[in-house]
């Protein structure tokens, strides 16, 4: 896959999965039922922690033989839960968010990057 193909995939993902500002994400988390998914690799999370109450499902797992029960167990049959995805800066999360939409999840938003969340004082859990 060349750089042009990657840019097209990213543009398509960004067109379908809205990216939230810190304020928008914080408001949604405090007012709406959410499932927060960190798609960074485990080594990244070990170094920085993860957003409070987030679960980790690395993009590498989502891209290969993904078992949807990892998400469905957290949804508790509640289709109204909003799924927020994030990574380090928002690129992988856009791609994963788009995949989740294509897989049938209805409410998927890109929280963006952990670095923005942390620099704005967002709540973080260490592991």
Give the residues covered by each predicted segment:
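Rhodanese-like catalytic fold shared by cysteine-dependent sulfurtransferases
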Residues: 1-34, 42-82, 91-127
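Short, surface-exposed ligand- or partner-binding patches at beta-edge/loop junctions that are enriched
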Residues: 86
